[in-house]
């Protein structure tokens, strides 16, 4: 048998069989912990840990994969938070965990999207949906981490790769504010860096609000729209409506790395 499912595990009898299976899938991205492949027939993403690819012959399973625990990987599988895509299955070779499976979202990473052309109203509605999901995960005691480049968008947000999330005994309200600020920071990077830094630095109110963890990014975007509309003397529904106020100087080494082309 080439592969079989055992409970919540998809088990392959050898590393060779898993490698052959992956060749039938579509590579869709790499991260610090592993590589992802899409199975278009099942609409699933297979994330395979880096150790799998680093071994040319056989795997020192006990040494390399001992850190991976099924309960740990699937600890959020039953939490219903629509903006989050959690692991729902594990992948094993001879019973040793080498990756996990999650559902696929037909969306792009934020850093692959041109922020000038998206509808700000749709963006705000999508942010509100994330806030609702963040309330759910915060009530479960989950502390988010490493959201950069792990947020997808296509009229709504999908947050992926929760490998480094953890349970925390912080008060729910404080935890929500912490998690919300983590998400907000990525939206600030996406919308502002290398595009509107100069405009914001010249406006006292926006400068005060920008990146302030006590002010949510939803409120900031509404204020930004108002200020931009005032400057260009017309409603601003997307940032390209205010092209002439964009940065005059190109940012040489932006912190937020975009992949637009």
What are the functions of these language-model segments?
Residues 44, 83, 100, 158-161, ...:
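Protein kinase-like catalytic core scaffold
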Residues 41, 96-98, 155:
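Conserved catalytic motifs of the protein kinase core domain
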Residues 154-261:
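C-lobe/activation-segment region of protein kinase-like
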Residues 80-127:
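Conserved structural core of kinase catalytic domains
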């Amino acid at each position: 048998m080439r592969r079989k499912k055992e409970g919540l595990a998809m088990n392959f009898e050898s590393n060779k069989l898993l490698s052959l299976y992956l060749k039938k899938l579509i590579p869709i991205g790499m991260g610090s912990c592993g590589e992802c492949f899409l199975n278009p027939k099942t609409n699933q993403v297979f994330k395979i840990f880096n150790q799998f690819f680093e071994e040319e012959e056989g795997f020192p399973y006990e040494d390399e994969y001992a850190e991976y625990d099924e309960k740990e990987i699937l600890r959020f599988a039953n939490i219903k938070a629509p903006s989050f895509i959690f692991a729902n299955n594990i992948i094993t070779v001879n019973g040793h965990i080498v990756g996990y499976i999650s559902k696929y979202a037909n969306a792009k990473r934020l850093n692959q999207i041109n922020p000038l052309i998206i509808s700000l109203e749709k963006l705000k509605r999508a942010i509100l949906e994330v806030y609702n999901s963040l309330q759910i995960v915060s009530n479960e005691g989950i502390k988010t981490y490493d959201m950069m480049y792990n947020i997808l968008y296509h009229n709504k947000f999908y947050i992926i790769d929760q490998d480094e999330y953890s349970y925390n005994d912080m008060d729910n309200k404080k935890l929500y504010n912490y998690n919300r600020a983590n998400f907000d920071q990525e939206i600030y990077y996406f919308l502002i860096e290398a595009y509107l830094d100069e405009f914001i630095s010249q406006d006292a109110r926006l400068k005060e609000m920008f990146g302030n963890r006590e002010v949510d990014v939803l409120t900031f975007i509404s204020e930004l729209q108002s200020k931009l509309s005032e400057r260009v003397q017309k409603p601003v529904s997307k940032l390209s409506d205010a092209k002439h106020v964009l940065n005059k100087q190109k940012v040489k080494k932006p912190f937020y790395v975009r992949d637009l082309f």
